[in-house]
Structures are given as structure tokens and as C-alpha cells.
Amino acid sequence: MTQNPQWLWQEVLTKLEQQLSRPTYETWIQPTAIQQWREDEIVLCAPNAFVLNHIQKYYGALITETIAELLQQPVKVRLTSPEGNTLAATQSFYSSRSGQSTRPGKKTPELNSKYTFSRFVVGPTNRMAHAAALAVAESPGRDFNPLVLCGGVGLGKTHLMQAIGHYRLDTQPDAKIFYVSTEQFTNDLIVAIRKDSLQTFREHYRTADILLVDDIQFIEGKEYTQEEFFYTFNTLHEAGKQIVLASDRPPHQIPGLQQRLSSRFSMGLIADIQPPDLETRMAILQKKAEAENLNLSRSVIEYIATHYTANIRELEGALLRAVTHIAISGLPMTVENLAPILNPTVEYAPAAPDVILQIAAEATGVSIEDLKGASRRREISTARQIAMYLMRQHTDLSLPRIGELFGGKDHTTVMYSCDKIGQLLTKNQKISQLVSQISDRINHHHQNL
């Protein structure tokens, strides 16, 4: 075959465009170009180091396998960027008989490699769920069986559930870990009925050492699925096998759930997960940034964490949008450059200054008059600085305007107060928790208007 790099890359782009969403394709794949094609090695050039790292992590295998299928031979792909960074995408394993790529080694469960205990950020709202999940991973089938993880969308239920699977596979590689959504369980059951292979279906699920079932609330109203799951549950539980369920609500609140299933789901531990507080949201963003080799300032992390409060998925999505736009535009990563990018997608409006003052006064035990006054007593001064900091975070007011609201303080006083509290958030746990609690109360009040 004549080596025509541009022809090859155009064919690859055509195939990838059909497989990926339009935003994904246009953001990550389309800006990348082929630089060199020699024998069994392809060199691709990404526009910058950030895009290079992202492609290598999330799309390297897909690109490599696509090229291998086009060339009908094994191929190595290297990624490079103008900054001189170079990474190996992956090496393909091509089977000429089937025309499909295959991978050597033992088949593993459908577990996301990112969902491990080491990458889970523990905070006050998920501490019990994390401890229970870890206990189950260390000693399955003993203390908490079943373990039911309850919470809203994007709060970490799936992460903890899959972390249990990873932990057991690390300590016991031959363990049978089944991770399945309720929808997949139902679909497998339907196929088994159609093919008259119910016994095979039952034997498959009832040989699990750990059964992880996501979105169990979707079992509502599915009578035959509930019937089969009831007997699967009983078989595993009686054999001392671990069952972990994830739901957006407690079992007794799932409509149409058979009483006998509700009773069994509730016989173990129901661990509730609530939306993360400000401190935890900041820690999540920091951990995410470290994992992606991103250098984010505290002000940027704090800005995103303050504006995205609903769940972790929303938080990480905001970070990805921000970093992607900054990487492509070439602008520095500052709060000023992020605001136009993030604000249009955030259901956010400035909180009322009097509401912030009222909540801050109640939480700190300092009157509004003292917050606005000139007293230098330590507890009053600290409360005033916290209130100024929160006013800065939750409103669009300028520093001079904030100073006016606090009895005519100079804007440099406001700036000093905001900087001081910002520094204390990483050094003083008591201050950090107090600021987080007040911030969450402000957000809650604003959302309920």
C-alpha cells in the first residue's frame, strides 16, 4: 500500500466522526493532524499538551484500533505536541481473520478504571458510605449485606460501587465480580426468556462472589424482573456472597417495589450520600486537576466550587468545559476568563447582600450591627472577614461596594479580608467548615426562592 498520510488520516477522521459525539469530535479529534507514517508507526500531532494528554487518556486506544483496522495490520501510534511532549497512544492487536481488534489476557468486569477508593474524595456528606463500601470490599458478605448506596445523580454511588469491585480484584484476582445496571439485568432476562435459556441466566448471576447492581430503582413495576431478582438475591445472600445496590432513593420509597424485596434491601445497611459541601467540592476539583496534570490556582478552584453545588458530575463537567476552552483559546486560566465561559451554563444569580449578612450573623453568633461596625475583637473581626469573603463569592459586587455595605470600609480592607479567609480555608479546619456551612446555606436559600 502506498503510504499517503493525509489519505489515511482523513479515513480515520471519517470513522471517528461516526463514532463520537459532535462536540467530542470537534474539540479533541478534529484539531489533531497526522505528522508522519513510516512502516508500522504513525505519529500524530495535537495542538497543545493538554489536548495531547486528553486524547492519550480517553481516545488513544480508539484511534489506534481504527488505524489498525484500516491498514489491516498491527500499528503503533505516537502522539506529540508543539511543546515537544510525546506519548504513546497504545499498540493494537489486530486479528486478520475476524477483521476486529482483540486484546490479550483475561476478561475483566465492566469497571471504570478511574473509579477506585484512592480517587474518591471523602467528606462529611459521604463519609459513612465510603467507610461502609471499604468495609464490604475488605470483608465481603459479612457486616453490611446488602449494602445499599442512596443518593441523587452524580454524587459518587457508582464510583464507590465500582471501587469495591476493583479492590476485590486487586486482592483476589479470580473473584467473580458482576457489575450490572438494572436495565442490563432486565435485558439479559428478556433475552433468556426469548432463547429459552433461563437456567443459563440464573446460573450466571447466581455464581457471583460480589453482585453490584446500579440504579435498582428502575426495577419498579417490572414484576417478572423483581421475581427473578428476588431469587437471585436469596441464593447469593444465603451463600454468604456480597450484594451492593445503588439507588436514588431508599428502598421503601421505590414505588411498585415488592414488599419482600424492600424488606431484603433494608436488612443490611442503607448508606446515604448527600451533595458535597464547599470544602469537599474544592478537594474534588483539586484531585481532578492533579490527576489531569492541571495547574489550577486556588481562586479558580474556589470559583468553580462555589458556582456548581448540585453534584460531582456537574462539578467535573464545569472543570472540563473551562479547561477545554482555555486550552483551545490560549488564554490564561483566571477567574476573569472563566466567568464568561461558565456563567451562561450555570443557573446562578447573585445572592442578596442582606441575606448573606443575615445568614453569616446567625452562623457566627455576631450581630449584623457588629459585622458592619468597627470592633476589633477577634471573634467579631473574624466573623466580619468571613462575611466579606462570602459577599465576594456570592455576589457580583465590587470591592468598594462591599466595603460600603460593611459600614464604609475601604476596598483594601475587603481585599485583605477575602485573601486572609481564602488562606485560612486550607489551614484552619474550623474556619473552613464554618465557611462551607454558611456558603451552602446561602445557596440553599437562593435555590428555594
Curated annotation (Swiss-Prot):
<keyword id="KW-0446">Lipid-binding</keyword>
<dbReference type="InterPro" id="IPR020591">
    <property type="entry name" value="Chromosome_initiator_DnaA-like"/>
</dbReference>
<dbReference type="InterPro" id="IPR013317">
    <property type="entry name" value="DnaA_dom"/>
</dbReference>
<feature type="binding site">
    <location>
        <position position="154"/>
    </location>
    <ligand>
        <name>ATP</name>
    </ligand>
</feature>
<keyword id="KW-0963">Cytoplasm</keyword>
<feature type="compositionally biased region" description="Polar residues">
    <location>
        <begin position="90"/>
        <end position="103"/>
    </location>
</feature>
<dbReference type="GO" id="GO:0005886">
    <property type="term" value="C:plasma membrane"/>
</dbReference>
<feature type="region of interest" description="Domain II">
    <location>
        <begin position="73"/>
        <end position="109"/>
    </location>
</feature>
<keyword id="KW-0238">DNA-binding</keyword>
<dbReference type="InterPro" id="IPR018312">
    <property type="entry name" value="Chromosome_initiator_DnaA_CS"/>
</dbReference>
<dbReference type="InterPro" id="IPR001957">
    <property type="entry name" value="Chromosome_initiator_DnaA"/>
</dbReference>
<comment type="subunit">
    <text>Oligomerizes as a right-handed, spiral filament on DNA at oriC.</text>
</comment>
<dbReference type="GO" id="GO:0016887">
    <property type="term" value="F:ATP hydrolysis activity"/>
</dbReference>
<feature type="region of interest" description="Domain I, interacts with DnaA modulators">
    <location>
        <begin position="1"/>
        <end position="73"/>
    </location>
</feature>
<dbReference type="Pfam" id="PF08299">
    <property type="entry name" value="Bac_DnaA_C"/>
</dbReference>
<dbReference type="GO" id="GO:0008289">
    <property type="term" value="F:lipid binding"/>
</dbReference>
<feature type="binding site">
    <location>
        <position position="157"/>
    </location>
    <ligand>
        <name>ATP</name>
    </ligand>
</feature>
<dbReference type="GO" id="GO:0005524">
    <property type="term" value="F:ATP binding"/>
</dbReference>
<comment type="similarity">
    <text>Belongs to the DnaA family.</text>
</comment>
<protein>
    <recommendedName>
        <fullName>Chromosomal replication initiator protein DnaA</fullName>
    </recommendedName>
</protein>
<dbReference type="GO" id="GO:0005737">
    <property type="term" value="C:cytoplasm"/>
</dbReference>
<dbReference type="InterPro" id="IPR003593">
    <property type="entry name" value="AAA+_ATPase"/>
</dbReference>
<dbReference type="GO" id="GO:0006270">
    <property type="term" value="P:DNA replication initiation"/>
</dbReference>
<feature type="region of interest" description="Domain IV, binds dsDNA">
    <location>
        <begin position="327"/>
        <end position="449"/>
    </location>
</feature>
<keyword id="KW-0235">DNA replication</keyword>
<comment type="function">
    <text>Plays an essential role in the initiation and regulation of chromosomal replication. ATP-DnaA binds to the origin of replication (oriC) to initiate formation of the DNA replication initiation complex once per cell cycle. Binds the DnaA box (a 9 base pair repeat at the origin) and separates the double-stranded (ds)DNA. Forms a right-handed helical filament on oriC DNA; dsDNA binds to the exterior of the filament while single-stranded (ss)DNA is stabiized in the filament's interior.</text>
</comment>
<keyword id="KW-0547">Nucleotide-binding</keyword>
<dbReference type="InterPro" id="IPR027417">
    <property type="entry name" value="P-loop_NTPase"/>
</dbReference>
<feature type="binding site">
    <location>
        <position position="156"/>
    </location>
    <ligand>
        <name>ATP</name>
    </ligand>
</feature>
<feature type="region of interest" description="Domain III, AAA+ region">
    <location>
        <begin position="110"/>
        <end position="326"/>
    </location>
</feature>
<dbReference type="InterPro" id="IPR013159">
    <property type="entry name" value="DnaA_C"/>
</dbReference>
<dbReference type="InterPro" id="IPR010921">
    <property type="entry name" value="Trp_repressor/repl_initiator"/>
</dbReference>
<keyword id="KW-0067">ATP-binding</keyword>
<feature type="binding site">
    <location>
        <position position="158"/>
    </location>
    <ligand>
        <name>ATP</name>
    </ligand>
</feature>
<dbReference type="InterPro" id="IPR038454">
    <property type="entry name" value="DnaA_N_sf"/>
</dbReference>
<feature type="region of interest" description="Disordered">
    <location>
        <begin position="90"/>
        <end position="110"/>
    </location>
</feature>
<dbReference type="InterPro" id="IPR024633">
    <property type="entry name" value="DnaA_N_dom"/>
</dbReference>
<dbReference type="GO" id="GO:0006275">
    <property type="term" value="P:regulation of DNA replication"/>
</dbReference>
<dbReference type="Pfam" id="PF00308">
    <property type="entry name" value="Bac_DnaA"/>
</dbReference>
<dbReference type="GO" id="GO:0003688">
    <property type="term" value="F:DNA replication origin binding"/>
</dbReference>
<dbReference type="Pfam" id="PF11638">
    <property type="entry name" value="DnaA_N"/>
</dbReference>
